[in-house]
Amino acid sequence: MAQPPLLRDVIDIKESISTSDFVLSLAEATTPAGAQHALRDYVVTERLLENFDEALALIKSSLDGHRSKAAYLHGSFGSGKSHFMAVLYALLSGDQAARARTEFDPVLTKHQWLSTDGKKFLLVPYHMLGAKALEQRVLGGYVTHVKKLCPEAPTPQVYRTDSLFADIRAMRANMGDEAVIRALGTSGADDAEEDEWGEGFAWTPQLLDTALAAEESHEAGVHLNLTNPSTPAELRAKLVNDAGTNLLPGFTQNAAEDEHGFISLDAGLSVIAEHAKSLGYDGLILFMDELILWLATLIHDQKFVAREASKITNFVEGGDARRAIPVMSFIARQRDLRELVGEEVSGAAESSIQDTLNLASGRFDKITLEDRKLPQIAHARLLKPKDAEAAQQVDAAFEQTKRVGPQVWDTLLGSEKGTTGADAESFRLTYPFSPAFMDTLVHISSALQRSRTGLKLMGQLLADHRDELRLGQLVPVGDLYPVIAQGGDKPFTDSLKVVFEAADKLYKTKLRPYLLSSYDITEDDVEQYRNRPESLTDPKKLNGCRMFTGDNRLVCTLLLSALAPSVPALSELTIRRLGALNHGSVLAPIPGAEVGIIKNKVAEWAARFPEIKETGTDANPGVRLELSGVDVDSVIANAQVNDNPGNRVALARRLLSEELGVEHGQLSDQLGFTWRGTARTAEIVFGNVADEDELPDHDLMPQEEGRWRIAIDLPFDEGEWGPVEDVNRVQRLRERQQGERSRTIAWLPAHLSATRFADFRRLVVIDKALADEHRFDTQYAGHLNADNRSRAKGLLETQREALLKQAKGAFKQAYGLAQKQAADVVPDFDDHLVALPDVDGLTLSFGQSLHDGIRHVAGKLLTHQYPAHPDLDPDATGTAVKPADTKKVFAHVRAAAEARDGRIEVPAADRKLMQRIAGPLRLGQQKEAYFELSRYWGDHFRQLARSQGVTGDLSLITLTDWTDRPDPRGLPDFLARLVVAAFAEMDDRVWVRGGTVLDPAPELAAIKDHDALRSQPLPAESDWDTARQRFETVFGAKPPALRRGRMVNQFARQIIEAARDYRDHAADLVHQLEAHASFLGLDQTADTGRLALARRSLQLLDALTAEAGKGAAGAKKTVEALASFDLGETSADRYGTSIKKARAVAEAVASAPWSTLELAAGLGPEGEALLDSLRNVARDDQRTADLRDALARTQREVVALIKRTQAAATPPPAPAASQPTAGDLSLDTPTSDPRIPYTSQETPTSSGGAGTARTSGGRRTTAARAVTDLQAELSDLAVRHPEATIEITWRVVE
């Protein structure tokens, strides 16, 4: 396919560009020739017509008001300020060429005064850079300009004459007055005579004395006659003029270079206005270029800037009420000085300068020359096709460019914040320069350049690439940097100078040499490729030069982004935008893959140069270049001692451990991972596999049964070994192992390339340097000052991150997880996995990370080891099943096993869990809502038991082993226990430990290794139902419903516990009833009644506990005992009442007042009736009559009967006997302690049982009656106050 034509074939491109091609100096702009030159190529736009209208209106207003006015002519670099002034000069001077341009008709029609008023203007250009003061450049520049226009015109009086007059006085003293007068240009006496007749003027010594003694005067509006001066002021002015012209002609030139050689700017403006008027001008127009730039270059001399800035207002205001003619000043500026002051100055100085600038800005008009018309100007001046056919070719190429894709297209158009327009039409005008390029050009040029316009830079780029740039190719933004850097211009601020110099140094000493060495080419090769590509026949060098050119453009774009970060296209630069700005510079085999290629290049550069930093995100990566000027290499050189084998191995192991996710254990490193939904562990060992001293055979063997050991070699060897020797070592070990080989696998990497290994060693040095902050500050970076140490540390930290990222990427290739690149690894080794056992399908998965890759390998190993392991993570969530999950699953499995149809509805929250665990484990099937139990494990275990002749208990160990039949499943212990426990529920088996049934059944976590499962014999269903009914009736508790082995044990345990709880009380009841059977009239031979039921109840309880502790068979017998016990004619309800009330009844019988009750027999018919009633209750069972109530009631009734009987038998009281006194005491008794006997008066007892029981008393009575009386009285007290404590005292008195 034919190549497109060179761009020079369709657009006129000069071979070389000179400054005069596009730059118009101010001196030229204010001359007829300069105006003609400007008009010839000038492109008039609508906006420029508005600008001319603004300028002319300002001039007209100044003339009409006879007031000085000023305006900022604001425009960025290359916006055509000089051309504007040249055309303005042509319009003001009535130039025919200007009037012939029809584009100016609207302006000339509006400003007809230009042709009708006959006004004459003096336009004075100024270039302010290098000025020592405003007066020096403005006033001195005026004198210089006027001398060129009118050599005969008198010199305006703008100089301070102190030094001039001192020189004249010295010359008079040395040479004499005659010689001085002659040198002033007069003939002495002869001229004096002519003067008397008014025909001429001649100096005399007297006139010299008068002139030298006169005061300097610059009063506005005062005309000085210099032809025939007569006043002292006129003589002084005449002397200054003649001396400057004839006697000391170098005075004005010397004064022009002296900042103190001029009068004040305010006075000077009045002087030159008067002077211009004397020359016949109606207005004085001052065009000052670079005034703001001049102040900006001196911004750090705050006093100077403040002084000079305060003078700016003199252009519109002055001490004089009115100048001779209006002074109109146009001050060109690219940047508002107020912005620069804010950036470069701080504090009170900033405030003072800002106030001054604000004052001036408020009095100045502003005419803005837009950059947005630059596309039209560039098209007209540079990019116009040669002819119609060429225009069609350019249009076709542009349409092809529009197909680059939306993201690239948007980047090429630039940002809406751009200054040059951002639409397709603008792009078409500037093609092959994109709007983003144009915007960058304007910003960069404004920041760095002074003497070259944007058009010149564009022309220079076209000229430089005229032999290689073809139609359809865009001019890359990166090509702009070399053009700017080679120009020799420096930025106008010190801070930018430092950054620019740092960028230039970085590019020339590091970046460009690195790119050249990367492709093994030289500067001569590049020069040959650019200018004589056909002569470059070496394909390798040709491709290297092509790759270098693209990379160089990218690097130069990064430098531009650091120099002008405010450019929208370069701000927060992304990889995608970096490629788009240099569209076509990086070629990819697949369209759209350029971003990945550039991203890899940037990552490599960031690892090499600390100034380059990767930014952004994985989805939208970016890059930033920071210029600091800090000597980082010296810090690295000081830390070079850390580059040793030990540190290299340690860092490699650390990086691999972090990437692989390896945990450091006490005995070995371990890899924790999830495989098929279960948590697993593999053993890891790092080392040189080929070195048997470093890794002996025993270090390659797994330490724990069932685990795999993965030996990971490092991607470099300090000795002579390589990956092939690593493979040979494993093969030798494999041959030595016979039978079942060890579960060992070696992961062998390819070695790093020489370049990448050098980068890794650099990473070791930087990592160690940054590891110890104290050592970094005192040893490695001790030669730097504190600020540079901090910057160096930040740069090294950034580079460490880049090198880490690079190393990890290279490691990924080395271990076979990414496509091997010769720049990163040695690409001749692919046998990365070598296992001792034969493992099918043992391959690496391309594109995985090291973290995922090793888990993929470990999963393959476990698949080989446990081929039948179920997948408990079907959704690949990477989460492992936990014991808490199995507890929930088991609860639902048990519930299903207890259901008659083997299915239950599972709560919605647990259905996902049942699908994940129960299904793959073959415990059952979880459907939409219901879980249905499976018979798989029951059939599986029973079949194995039959085939192996196993009877009796099935141990947990045996059943766990059987889960690996016919193929190993390798279930974790807690999952194997879940399976066995589920089988226990399915097959209705009970857990036994040490031969004893575990009741209740243990939780999953409580199952021990030596536990076993036993078949539980079941009672007949009728017995089960009868026992359940009787248990609930007799004992009042709820029995289990399902007739299952575990339930039988549970039920038996409930029966036995209940029987044991009541047995002793039932026995006590029988004992008490038998002890009082005679009194209560109980027939001990009867088959019915209370005593008979109590005895049968005791027999029932004894029968229920007889089989306790006899295992599963005993449990069955216990249930059967309850079901088969002969209750006789008595219902279970009455048995239950007898048993449950046994304790209370036995206690009542034991504590009954039998002596009181026995008295009833001697109380006649009433007493006998009471006893008969009590005995009838005692003979009936407890459900029929409550014996406790009967005993208490009978006691009360007996006591009441006794009281009634006593009251009826007591005679009337006898007269009270007189009590003996001391006089009645006989003294003839033999005792020495005679006493008066006390005889208590008998108190009659209450006639009824009512009333309050006596709490004390005493009487004299006979012994026979005392028993009955005391018993009756105390019985009543016992009834009313059973807990009262009493004291009994008695003695024989007769």
Curated annotation (Swiss-Prot):
The keyword GTP-binding does not apply. GO terms for biological process: defense response to virus. Keywords: Antiviral defense. Signal peptide: none annotated. Induction: Constitutively expressed, not induced by bacteriophage phiC31, probably part of a pglY-pglZ operon. Residues 1205-1263 are annotated as: Disordered. Disruption phenotype: Strain is no longer resistant to plaque formation by bacteriophage phiC31 (a Pgl- phenotype). Residues 1252-1263 have a biased composition (Low complexity). It comes from the Bacteria. Residues 1228-1244 have a biased composition (Polar residues). The keyword Hydrolase does not apply. BREX systems (bacteriophage exclusion) provide immunity against bacteriophage. Part of a type 2 BREX system. Previously called the phage growth limitation (Pgl) system, it confers protection against bacteriophage phiC31. The bacteria allows one cycle of phage infection, but subsequent cycles are impaired, protecting the original bacterial colony. The system undergoes high rates (10(-3) to 10(-4)) of phase reversion, i.e. loss and regain of phiC31 resistance. This is ATPase PglY. It comes from Streptomyces coelicolor (strain ATCC BAA-471 / A3(2) / M145). The gene is pglY.
